Design a protein with these regions (language model features):
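Class I S-adenosyl-L-methionine-dependent methyltransferase catalytic core
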Residues: 4-156
Length: 156
């Protein structure tokens, strides 16, 4: 019975069925997906980023960056051209909201193309430029993403 990642209704009983083979299609051990350098470089040529708002010592893309310790959500991003590849977990909506509220700066985001989410409809759709990426992004150190991606540009 442990072969699939969904619930099957069997009369009044529900069997939880999981698959080790397919779990990677839907979950990850970490919400962090390191930006591919070539994708960042292409966007940096266009936007000239000065700040990476969601980074670590190992994967920051700009010389100025905020890590977990600095808590990018509590920092001021205004007046700067920002790169944002946030953790893709439950907190992603907070990051997208903050990016959408930027004043006097630009925030370019690499995000999962989850067009069915509240954060997409509340902060992105009709309010930002969206560039859907063809195919699946190959994240540094992880291989192809199990989800489609998009670039979202907040440029008030």
């Amino acid at each position: 019975m442990d072969n699939w990642l969904f619930y099957r209704n069997m009369g009044n009983l529900f069997y939880k069925i999981t698959s080790r083979m397919n779990q990677g299609l839907f979950t990850s051990n970490t919400p962090e997906w390191e930006t591919p350098q070539e994708l960042f470089d292409e966007l940096d040529m266009e936007f000239h980023f000065g700040l990476d708002v969601c980074a670590s010592k190992e994967n920051h893309k700009c010389s100025t960056w905020f890590g977990k310790k600095e808590d990018g959500l509590s920092q001021d991003w205004s007046g700067v051209r920002c790169w944002m590849n946030p953790p893709y977990g439950r907190e992603i909506g907070k990051w997208v909201k903050k990016a959408s509220e930027i004043q006097g700066g630009v925030v370019v985001c690499l995000l999962p193309a989850r067009t069915d989410t509240k954060w997409f409809h509340d902060y992105i759709y009709g309010k930002a430029e969206i560039r859907f990426l063809k195919g699946r992004v190959k994240f540094s150190g992880k291989g192809p993403a199990p989800f489609p991606s998009m670039i979202v540009i907040f440029n008030p």
